[in-house]
């Protein structure tokens, strides 16, 4: 028998107005509908209705993980420092890692992901190729000290995540485990009713090679991705690669210095000279683990520090400050040029191809130089694709202009390879009787993030609108207010429950019909069944929450329809 939840006994307190600090739709509605409450910055409590939705998402994830052969475990969230030191992630995670000490001074962390601990577990449990492949997963809270928690549960410091890990003896096995997860994720997000895109991505601090993100398009999303209208190319903006066009061989004039007073920015320089910003060469200075690096890009483009950081990893990248120019005659703030930077590593975007001519800094105050040609007047140490992707940039696959969109990351899959196995010497005895280094995959789904993404994608002006698979109930029965209507509503609710239907029934006394109807729309159960003006005749009104379609049904018809 399915549960019948009476709102007269349910701890729920809806709000008429949006929270003052709410910036996104999911934040506003999940708080107003009393699904979650803020405990501290980035830390949320899940209330009865919200916990049901969260559990339903976790159930779908668990069912599909089990179906693909995953084995569920539960590892601790409080973890020792040493395994993360062994892989370098104790430092790589930086300030996002929650660190703490016990009373004896031993250092620990709250797990952001569990690659190290799962690797150690498999090292202890598996000794032969016969023990592999194996896929282990858990659904557990994760912790990251976000600098600016925002968007409600979308970017919190504690969040619920499914993380799974595959262990194989060969790269071919890893590819199969990766494909299994990819297919399972598609099934999961389809069952949840999430519109999603699969895009190429970068691995970041996780390490490894192949990596794809599952993104849910939504205006509140913090990820930007591109897709091509002409082919199937799609990628996170940090993973987009630019194919430099061929440069015609042209004999450029000699370098000529220009008097350019008070033009330390590209905007002021372009205006002063009356040239487009694209004719200028912007030279951004950064520090990579304390070493100054110059990055050259066309003046009308911006440097993507995320991309740059990926290229320079594991070095920590930060912008230079005014103090970094002190005592450096070769670096003139606002007038840096690539020529004469022998003491500085020079990285250029592929658009700064050999043979291209630029207007750029002359390394003198109030002075620029024109006809500065890459490959003739300065050398590039490394060509790296480091510009921010823009709408209309050419697709790397077919050349068509790319489209930009915002999205919420709901899943990420990685082929890690042997990074973690190398750190812990994870070997098994192979078929030939010799040690074989294990190869590994890592796969995550943001369970609580999926709730936020669904709220963003499915809500309307009235409130939440959950898909049946994860809604807190199948039907929301509303008693309009009179005793007869309440009696009918409770009777129908019990009969529906007996038929296996999950029911939320609003039997609250002293609450106006208008408030009940508003709450039903806000809470977002997919079907709303009203015991109203025709209750004496045994007739109810059924409303589809998503489409707004209404029809009148007898009690028997309603039970037959909703229990089918």
Curated annotation (Swiss-Prot):
<dbReference type="GO" id="GO:0004827">
    <property type="term" value="F:proline-tRNA ligase activity"/>
</dbReference>
<dbReference type="InterPro" id="IPR050062">
    <property type="entry name" value="Pro-tRNA_synthetase"/>
</dbReference>
<keyword id="KW-0648">Protein biosynthesis</keyword>
<dbReference type="InterPro" id="IPR023717">
    <property type="entry name" value="Pro-tRNA-Synthase_IIa_type1"/>
</dbReference>
<dbReference type="Pfam" id="PF04073">
    <property type="entry name" value="tRNA_edit"/>
</dbReference>
<dbReference type="InterPro" id="IPR002314">
    <property type="entry name" value="aa-tRNA-synt_IIb"/>
</dbReference>
<dbReference type="GO" id="GO:0005829">
    <property type="term" value="C:cytosol"/>
</dbReference>
<keyword id="KW-0963">Cytoplasm</keyword>
<keyword id="KW-0067">ATP-binding</keyword>
<keyword id="KW-0547">Nucleotide-binding</keyword>
<dbReference type="InterPro" id="IPR044140">
    <property type="entry name" value="ProRS_anticodon_short"/>
</dbReference>
<comment type="similarity">
    <text>Belongs to the class-II aminoacyl-tRNA synthetase family. ProS type 1 subfamily.</text>
</comment>
<comment type="subunit">
    <text>Homodimer.</text>
</comment>
<comment type="function">
    <text>Catalyzes the attachment of proline to tRNA(Pro) in a two-step reaction: proline is first activated by ATP to form Pro-AMP and then transferred to the acceptor end of tRNA(Pro). As ProRS can inadvertently accommodate and process non-cognate amino acids such as alanine and cysteine, to avoid such errors it has two additional distinct editing activities against alanine. One activity is designated as 'pretransfer' editing and involves the tRNA(Pro)-independent hydrolysis of activated Ala-AMP.</text>
</comment>
<dbReference type="InterPro" id="IPR036754">
    <property type="entry name" value="YbaK/aa-tRNA-synt-asso_dom_sf"/>
</dbReference>
<dbReference type="InterPro" id="IPR033730">
    <property type="entry name" value="ProRS_core_prok"/>
</dbReference>
<dbReference type="InterPro" id="IPR004154">
    <property type="entry name" value="Anticodon-bd"/>
</dbReference>
<dbReference type="GO" id="GO:0006433">
    <property type="term" value="P:prolyl-tRNA aminoacylation"/>
</dbReference>
<keyword id="KW-0030">Aminoacyl-tRNA synthetase</keyword>
<dbReference type="GO" id="GO:0002161">
    <property type="term" value="F:aminoacyl-tRNA deacylase activity"/>
</dbReference>
<protein>
    <recommendedName>
        <fullName>Proline--tRNA ligase 1</fullName>
        <ecNumber>6.1.1.15</ecNumber>
    </recommendedName>
</protein>
<keyword id="KW-0436">Ligase</keyword>
<dbReference type="InterPro" id="IPR007214">
    <property type="entry name" value="YbaK/aa-tRNA-synth-assoc-dom"/>
</dbReference>
<dbReference type="GO" id="GO:0005524">
    <property type="term" value="F:ATP binding"/>
</dbReference>
<dbReference type="InterPro" id="IPR045864">
    <property type="entry name" value="aa-tRNA-synth_II/BPL/LPL"/>
</dbReference>
<dbReference type="InterPro" id="IPR004500">
    <property type="entry name" value="Pro-tRNA-synth_IIa_bac-type"/>
</dbReference>
<dbReference type="InterPro" id="IPR006195">
    <property type="entry name" value="aa-tRNA-synth_II"/>
</dbReference>
<dbReference type="InterPro" id="IPR036621">
    <property type="entry name" value="Anticodon-bd_dom_sf"/>
</dbReference>
<dbReference type="Pfam" id="PF03129">
    <property type="entry name" value="HGTP_anticodon"/>
</dbReference>
<dbReference type="Pfam" id="PF00587">
    <property type="entry name" value="tRNA-synt_2b"/>
</dbReference>
<dbReference type="InterPro" id="IPR002316">
    <property type="entry name" value="Pro-tRNA-ligase_IIa"/>
</dbReference>
